[in-house]
């Protein structure tokens, strides 16, 4: 075959593309277990953060097993359903009709006190925001939160990840009597109510996104939260 001809060049290019694609596929498959492990460790760390437990990729599995005593899924009627709570993808659930969503519940024991940890997901200014909120045994008082985001503005909306902002939610109440009210994020440093926290300066839209995210997801969990 003429190595200077178009046919040779074409066949050579095809073979090269196939070989490179095969190598990339092999590399991707070999890395997948490690990538899955990293995602699971990060998820454990985030859940633990909502109950004020610091962890690393190296010890997150151990600490998760130490503090998380039970995990299960409920539906929007508050009924337990079959499934693995840890494996539920909240981002995918967010796009399903509400009545079809699976709602994970993680039950922790912190110094002998029961805490309920619930995942939450919503929209910020520039993209999705998500996190976890933990409640005391009364399913009303906030024990802790963890928030993260995809693309909020550094120094503004991205401040939802800071300990300062998260600490504001501690000991706030999500119910007023028997009515679910969520947590109101107030602009201007005027948060004095039992269910109010201060908004991030310059990050009003993201702050309101956090407020909506918490209220919406707690509404899905409301039948479960009202079980005593």
Question: What are these language model-derived features?
Answer:
Residues 2-228:
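Flexible, solvent-exposed loop/hinge segments and secondary-structure transition points
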